[in-house]
């Protein structure tokens, strides 16, 4: 099958590698332009560009695609059977949707119609889901609203973070993509419309999503901590400074939301619905990560201290 592959992040790399390994003819890889990165702000390739070059595939990096006649002519000349889109990061214009006979095939990291949007892995964990998965779908003009082709489930382990779950879903999605293309090529797959009434959203994460609300239950806070690791993390304030929680667990204790209590070497903080957290690893603004016992010894929090948003 003649393909064009559009993708940018690390999540998309296994999909590119798998379709090449399956023998598909990837004529072009489309990825976002090189971006400044690191202290020196030197230009860095996207993970997909690195992978494409390692596979000796041609790469293009248009700044825009919607009204880009040169790019349109380039794709038209290739005449792909399908265009594969995995985390490309740009809205696919209608001309591109209409170009290939088999359509634009997307790998989305959720069990659609749940968690449509840019951060499905993070929000599935943050909302306490025990199972998630991947969906292959045909792209239409909406946001992850196209007809579904195949789905595969994956359990979310209690200790999973978005950082640990993403590589497993990327591999599962790559395998599902190869199966989807084989079935499309053989004409033995039927696209199924989504039940739009059951959709939920997974919007792009903002820094403020990491702000801890201690009126949530301990389990809700833990779910969000796991989902928002590594970014934006889970943070609050202590004595007017930023205070990041990296590891914690729910415990049986009755404290007011945000109230701190020391029990031996254990540091507890109250949460909502008569629940509490034991903080295991924390980080103060401008400092290194530390075990809670080191924080207790160094800062000696007392009954007057609380964790929470600064008052205005």
UniProtKB/Swiss-Prot annotation:
The keyword Transferase applies. It holds the Pfam family Formyl_trans_C. The keyword Cytoplasm does not apply. GO terms for molecular function: methionyl-tRNA formyltransferase activity. Its EC number is 2.1.2.9. CDD domains: FMT_core_Met-tRNA-FMT_N (cd08646), Met_tRNA_FMT_C (cd08704). It catalyses: L-methionyl-tRNA(fMet) + (6R)-10-formyltetrahydrofolate = N-formyl-L-methionyl-tRNA(fMet) + (6S)-5,6,7,8-tetrahydrofolate + H(+). (6S)-5,6,7,8-tetrahydrofolate binds at residues 110-113. Keywords: Protein biosynthesis, Transferase. One of its GO terms (cellular component) is cytosol. Attaches a formyl group to the free amino group of methionyl-tRNA(fMet). The formyl group appears to play a dual role in the initiator identity of N-formylmethionyl-tRNA by promoting its recognition by IF2 and preventing the misappropriation of this tRNA by the elongation apparatus. Belongs to the Fmt family. This is Methionyl-tRNA formyltransferase.
